[in-house]
From Swiss-Prot:
The keyword S-adenosyl-L-methionine applies. This is O-methyltransferase af390-400. Signal peptide: none annotated. GO terms for molecular function: O-methyltransferase activity. Gene3D superfamilies: Vaccinia Virus protein VP39, Winged helix-like DNA-binding domain superfamily/Winged helix DNA-binding domain. The keyword Transferase applies. InterPro entries: COMT-like, O_MeTrfase_dom, SAM-dependent_MTases_sf, WH-like_DNA-bd_sf, WH_DNA-bd_sf.
Length: 400
C-alpha cells in the first residue's frame, strides 16, 4: 500500500493543469475527487485544526498582504523569485521584513505563493492575478471582509435569538442584524463605494468562472422566434449588473440589431458600466420602487442571473409578477439562470451559496420550490436546462 501511495504522490506532483485544456468537465471531476480524497484522509483532529485555526487565519493574513500592496507591487515588477527583503520593498506600504517573513510562510503553505529556498518565494499564477488590477481578484476577495465574514460570525447568535427558525423576512435578516447601519446588503453597497466595489468585483470574477449560458440554452431557437422589427427588444437582462451575460449573447449572435439587448439595473450600477458594443443599451430600473412597472414591454426574453436567489420566495414572486405583467402571451419567455438544488448530493458550491443567501433571508431552491415560485407568479414552468457542471441551470417559464 505504501508503494502505491508513493507512486500516486509522484504522479500528482507532476500534474500540469494544461492537460485539461478544453476539458473543463474532466478537470472539475478530478478536483471533486481530490477534495473527497482529502476529506477521507483528514483525521478529526486535523479537520478541527483546519476549520478553527488554519482557514480563518489564512484569509486574514492574505487580506493584510493585499492591503499592503505586496501582490500589486510584485506583479508590476514582473513577478519572479524574490527574497523577503525585496518583497518588503515591493510593497506599497512600509512593511517590516520580519513581519512579512511570518506571513509569507503561511501563504506558501496554502499554495498562494511558492517557497523556492530559505526566505525566497516565487508567485503562482493566482498570486499574480491578485496583483493584476484588471482581473479584479483582489477587490473580489474583499467581499469576505466587507460582507461575508462578519455576517457568518453573527449567524449562530442570530439563530439563537430567532429561536432557530428559517429566516423569511427580507427586512429582518441576519445580514441586517449584523451591521450597525441596519441596512440590507444592497443598501449597504449603495451607501459605501468600497462595499459596492467588492461586490461588483466578486460578481465579475464569479461570472467569468461560470459556463456561458448561451452554451447550454438554445439562444438561436429563441432568436428564430423573435420579432426584432421597429427596435423590439430581444433579451432584457433584469438586474444584469456588469452586462457579461448579454455580452455572451452578442458574441454568439453578431448580427443582432443595435439596442436589441437591454441591460437593466439600479441607476448607480448601469451608470458605471462600460460597454464595447452598440447591441446593448442600458436602462435604469429599481425592481422595488413603488408604483413603477417594468419599463421594457413585450421582449422576447426576460433574463435574470443569480437575482432571485438574493430574495425570499415571497419577494421573488413579486419580482416575477412584475415581469409577467408586461410579457406578450405566446411569445415572451422568462429565463432564470440560477442554482437548482438537487434532491440529493448537492455540491459544496450549491450548499454554501444556499446558506450564504439564507443569511439575507433568501435561499437557493430545489425543483419543487422553483415550480411553486413560478406558479405563484402566474407563470408556467417549461423546462430546466442544466449547465452540465452541476452549478446552475436556466429555468424557462412563460405565460400559461
Amino acid at each position: 500500500m505504501a508503494d502505491i501511495a508513493e507512486q500516486l504522490i509522484e504522479k500528482l506532483q507532476t500534474l500540469e493543469t494544461s492537460i485539461f485544456e478544453g476539458q473543463d468537465a474532466t478537470r472539475q471531476k478530478l478536483a471533486l475527487a481530490a477534495r473527497k480524497l482529502f476529506h477521507t484522509l483528514e483525521t478529526k483532529e486535523e479537520k478541527t485544526m483546519r476549520l478553527a485555526i488554519e482557514e480563518p487565519v489564512m484569509f486574514s493574513v492574505l487580506q493584510a498582504l493585499i492591503d499592503t500592496g505586496l501582490f500589486e507591487g510584485w506583479a508590476a515588477a514582473g513577478g519572479g523569485e524574490r527574497d523577503v527583503t525585496e518583497l518588503a520593498k515591493l510593497s506599497k506600504r512600509d512593511v517590516e521584513p520580519e513581519l512579512l517573513r511570518h506571513q509569507l510562510r503561511l501563504m506558501a503553505a496554502n499554495h498562494i505563493i511558492l517557497e523556492t529556498a530559505n526566505d525566497r518565494y516565487a508567485p503562482t499564477p493566482y498570486a499574480l492575478a491578485i496583483g493584476d488590477k484588471s482581473t479584479k481578484v483582489a477587490p473580489a476577495l474583499r467581499i469576505r471582509t466587507d460582507h461575508v465574514a462578519p455576517c457568518a460570525m453573527h449567524w449562530p447568535d442570530f439563530l439563537a435569538k430567532t429561536n432557530y427558525r428559517k429566516p423569511r423576512d427580507d427586512k429582518a435578516s441576519c445580514y441586517i442584524d449584523t451591521f450597525p447601519e441596519k441596512k440590507s446588503f444592497f443598501e449597504r453597497c449603495s451607501a459605501n463605494p468600497v462595499h459596492q466595489e467588492s461586490f461588483s468585483s466578486f460578481m465579475d470574477v464569479w461570472a467569468k468562472g461560470k459556463r456561458p449560458w448561451p452554451e447550454f440554452y438554445d439562444t438561436q431557437a429563441l432568436l428564430d422566434g423573435a420579432d426584432l422589427s421597429n427596435g423590439s427588444p430581444f433579451v432584457v437582462d433584469v438586474g444584469g449588473h456588469h452586462g457579461i451575460d448579454l455580452m455572451r449573447v452578442a458574441e454568439k449572435h453578431p448580427d443582432l440589431p443595435a439596442g436589441s439587448l437591454v441591460l437593466e439595473d439600479l441607476p448607480d450600477v448601469v451608470g458605471a458600466v462600460h460597454l464595447t458594443t452598440d447591441k446593448i443599451r442600458t436602462v435604469a430600473h429599481d425592481l422595488f420602487e413603488e408604483g413603477v412597472e417594468q419599463p421594457i414591454k413585450g421582449a422576447r426574453a426576460y433574463f435574470m442571473h443569480a437575482v432571485l436567489h438574493d430574495w425570499s420566495d415571497e419577494t421573488s414572486v413579486k419580482i416575477l409578477r412584475q415581469i409577467a405583467a408586461v410579457m406578450k402571451p405566446g411569445y415572451s419567455k422568462v429565463l432564470i439562470n440560477d442554482i437548482v438544488i438537487p434532491s440529493t448530493g448537492a455540491s459544496c458550491y450549491q450548499a454554501a451559496m444556499d446558506c450564504l443567501v439564507l443569511q439575507a433571508s433568501a435561499n437557493e431552491r430545489t425543483e419543487a420550490v422553483w415550480s411553486k415560485v413560478i406558479k405563484d407568479a402566474g407563470l408556467k414552468l417549461v423546462k430546466y436546462y442544466p449547465d452540465g457542471r452541476g452549478y446552475e441551470s436556466v429555468i424557462e417559464a412563460e405565460l400559461p
